[in-house]
Amino acid sequence: MVLTILFSAYKLCRFFAMSSPRPGAERLAVPGPDGGGGAGPWWTAGGRGPREVSPGVGAEVQGALERALPELQQALSALKQAGGGRAVGAGLAEVFQLVEEAWLLPAMGREVAQGLCDAIRLEGGLDLLLRLLQAPELETRVQAARLLEQILVAENRRDRVARIGLGVILNLAKEREPVELARSVAGILEHMFKHSEETCQRLVAAGGLDAVLYWCRRTDPALLRHCALALANCAMHGGQAAQRRMVEKRAAEWLFPLAFSKEDELLRLHACLAVAVLATNKEVEREVERSGTLALVEPLVASLDPGRFARCLVDASDTSQGRGPDDLQRLVPLLDSSRMEAQCIGAFYLCAEAVIMHIKNRNKVFSDIGAIQSLKRLVSYSTNGTTSALAKRALRLLGEEVPRPILPCVASWKEAEVQTWLQQIGFSQYCESFREQQVDGDLLLRLTEEELQTDLGMKSGITRKRFFRELTELKTFANYATCDRSNLADWLGSLDPRFRQYTYGLVSCGLDRSLLHRVSEQQLLEDCGIRLGVHRVRILTAAREMLHSPLPCTGSKPSGDVPDVFISYRRNSGSQLASLLKVHLQLHGFSVFIDVEKLEAGKFEDKLIQSIMSARNFVLVLSAGALDKCMQDHDCKDWVHKEIVTALSCGKNIVPVIDGFEWPEPHTLPEDMQAVLTFNGIKWSHEYQEATIEKIIRFLQGRSSRDSSAGSDTSLEGAAPMGPT
């Protein structure tokens, strides 16, 4: 009776949800004998005999499968016997609808869909789909790819597709077009990158990564979302070798337009996840930083609500049940990373997943994967407000105790702060002995194992190891600004995040960065307490190498701060093109400045003006309505207006790039910017991006866009200027 009510209620909800048009709804309609829709979802059908299912499933899941499996078997049988393209298409659509609606079932959707996916594999459906993916008819390949994307659960990835289907998928990826096929193939690659490290590396080596990076320049939202998730999965599951190949193929740069999107928050978050994972690899961290994509992570996360993000995931069929334990486990190392961006995006995703798991009463999974302690560590030690707030929210949703934040200036702690810290790390039984010995922050940071055993009564060697593990973490996250004048802590952290633990021992001996190269290894051991010989060697080697290179903290201005190109754009219509231009120009060796909304309040205008003045070239993105706000702006308050006027007054090489823009009459613009209409514009082509970029580069390399001969090039990109007449 309860199951009947559940299914009836779900049918009623879907009726009201489908009574108004929604994107993609029409693809779920299955033609019936009269050409109309089918008889309705399988869970509302009655009169079917029971079918045996796995004995371990719950009663509700078993009931749903008993209704669905006969209908699925019938649809698969009809698909196998289909003779023509129309019949094959109808069969694929019917199976697709059954699986799609299973994923959308509330609470038990993952289990029911898993059962259907297993049945398709056992009935030979995977082999059939792999054959249909090689069919000559494009529509058949599109529908088969769409269905395969829906059923690539772990067992199906492992059983057949990874063993015999990678070649078929890679051949489809080489087609690149049309977008309907690319969308599903990107989704398939998204799933297959999760299969194993070996499979991931095979896909990277055989062209799968190249296809995903190529599609990053497209504009289809669903395709771009698959690309972002595919790159995130490749980074998380492919190991360091795959991460190196991703950076070599400039994946960090191609993630920029995805993370810079103004229309799709899910897309931006998945792209930020991908670049944050890449940045945790110390071998490629610097290259990832230079891409500029990493700077987008924290501002984006700070602007979003994980609860709303969780609702978006629940509303999508492929994420409605939240991530599985294996996927969640991959997020935990982000929390333990030394990179703030990785901690921030990891805390956001786990907070959103905590919302979903809280609704579905599956909180235990967070304890199983070890996320609770990592979240508590962030609350205690993170100095980033966004990260700490997200970790607190996740812990509350999971019903866990939220620890108090640790004051970062540990050296200044009084005895009371030491007592609080002992209680938080689970060493309350030693509070009395620490109190009797009057241990404050200074003594805590210089505590030795002998003192811990003899003076503080910690007899067990294992207990002392646990204590020093917590103390090392405290030393690593501590702020030494009050005693570390040469910023030794950050320099040590740049060698290895673990080396920050040695900061207080070094500065307590009166050492700074200018003296470190004069110290012997024995002095580091005996005076500074650095017990590990390998660490001593690495620190001394780096200190002596530092003599031959400028200090990172010196006041000299790095050349990377002087851009070759400044890109000006209108946010509401030109963001996507501006970000694409940035990537293309970076790949051709140009340094590019583009505002990423991370400038401090009050310094926004100064930073922009300085960047324009220092850049040789000024690329003006003229998207739809780009100059509308400039009209009647006689006080020059509009940012695009200010940027154009500054570029004109500084004599910059101005290169307008046109995309859906209509030139206004000169008299409608303020007089101080009318001269911009005399420059030759380059018409942007999404279909022929490389050709367009080549022309832009010719203008940037010394051929002024004011040169009238430039506009005479007979190419599809050229757009004549509209000067005053």
UniProtKB/Swiss-Prot annotation:
Tissues with expression: Highest expression seen in the spleen and the brain, followed by lung, kidney, liver and other tissues.
Keywords: Cell projection, Cytoplasm, Differentiation, Hydrolase, Immunity, Innate immunity, Mitochondrion, NAD, Neurogenesis, Phosphoprotein, Repeat, Synapse, Transit peptide
CC terms in the record's Gene Ontology section: axon; cytoplasm; dendrite; microtubule; mitochondrion; synapse
Superkingdom of the source species: Eukaryota
Transit peptide: 1-27
Pfam families linked to this entry: SAM_2 (PF07647), TIR_2 (PF13676)
UniProt domain TIR: residue ranges: 561-704
Organism: Sus scrofa (Pig)
Entry-linked Gene3D superfamilies: Leucine-rich Repeat Variant, Toll/interleukin-1 receptor homology (TIR) domain, Transcription Factor, Ets-1
Residues binding NAD(+) 2: R570, R571, E600
Subcellular localization(s) per the UniProt record: Cytoplasm; Cell projection, Axon; Cell projection, Dendrite; Synapse
CDD domains: SAM_SARM1-like_repeat2, SARM1_N
Protein name: NAD(+) hydrolase SARM1
Modified residues (Phosphoserine): S549, S559
